[in-house]
C-alpha cells in the first residue's frame, strides 16, 4: 500500500510542478553542467526476488560534452554524469536494509528540447553498500545497472525532471546465490543547467 501511495504522491507532485513552471532555461548545451537533487522509488518486477520496494534520494553532477548530433527526432547532445545516493532503503520481507550508493558511470542522451520539455535516455552503473544483505541471504555489497527515460521540464530558474527507471541490483557473483532484484521506479528531481563558456 505504501508504494502505491508514494507513486500517487510523486505523480501529483509532478503534475503540480509542471503547471507551475514557465519557459526560461535553454536546457543542455555543449560545455554546460547539470546539477540536480532527486528522489525516487518503486517496486520489484519479475526476474529476481519479489516483494521488495526501494526508496532512494541523491545528487547528480553532469557534463554536457557535445553539440547536437544525429538527424530528426534522435537529434541531441551527449552528457556524462555521476550520482551520489546517500539515502537508499530496500524494503524486503525479512528486514529493511539501509545504505548508500554511488553511480560513477552515467551515460545520458539529451534529445533536442521541444518547447519547455527536454526528454532524455540514460544508462547508469554503480555500487550499493547496505547494512543488511540485499537480497536476504546474499551480500551487503551490490552493483546497480539502470536504464531510464524521462524529461526535463524547463523553468525560469530551475528545471524539474520526471522519469521512469529500471534498476537491476545484484552482487555479480560475490556471493552465492545471486538472485538479484529488479525494480521499476519513478524518480522526480529538481536541478539546473549551467551554460557553457562561449568560444
Write out the residue ranges for each language-model feature.
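Short loop/turn motifs that connect adjacent beta-strands in outer-membrane beta-barrel proteins
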Residues: 24-32, 66-78, 112-118, 154-160, ...
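Transmembrane beta-strands of outer-membrane beta-barrel pores
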Residues: 39-45, 63, 84-90, 125-131, ...
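Gram-negative (and chloroplast) outer-membrane scaffold detector with strong preference
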Residues: 57-131
Amino acid at each position: 500500500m505504501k508504494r502505491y501511495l508514494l507513486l500517487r504522491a510523486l505523480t501529483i507532485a509532478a503534475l503540480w510542478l509542471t503547471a507551475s513552471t514557465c519557459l526560461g532555461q535553454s536546457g543542455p548545451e555543449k560545455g554546460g553542467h547539470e546539477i540536480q537533487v532527486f528522489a525516487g522509488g518503486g517496486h520489484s518486477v519479475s526476474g529476481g526476488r519479489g516483494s521488495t520496494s526501494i526508496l532512494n534520494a541523491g545528487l547528480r553532477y553532469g557534463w554536457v560534452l557535445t553539440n547536437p548530433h544525429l538527424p530528426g527526432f534522435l537529434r541531441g547532445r551527449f552528457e556524462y554524469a555521476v550520482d551520489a545516493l546517500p539515502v537508499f532503503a530496500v524494503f524486503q520481507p525479512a528486514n529493511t536494509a539501509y545504505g548508500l550508493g554511488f553511480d560513477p558511470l552515467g551515460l545520458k542522451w539529451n534529445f533536442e528540447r521541444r518547447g519547455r520539455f527536454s526528454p532524455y535516455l540514460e544508462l547508469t552503473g554503480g555500487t550499493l553498500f547496505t547494512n543488511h544483505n540485499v537480497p536476504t541471504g546474499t551480500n551487503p555489497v551490490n552493483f546497480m545497472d539502470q536504464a531510464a527515460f524521462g524529461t526535463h521540464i524547463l523553468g525560469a530558474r530551475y528545471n524539474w525532471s520526471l522519469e521512469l527507471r529500471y534498476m537491476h541490483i545484484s552482487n555479480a557473483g560475490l556471493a552465492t546465490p545471486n538472485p538479484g532484484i529488479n525494480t521499476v521506479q519513478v524518480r522526480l528531481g529538481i536541478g539546473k543547467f549551467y551554460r557553457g563558456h562561449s568560444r
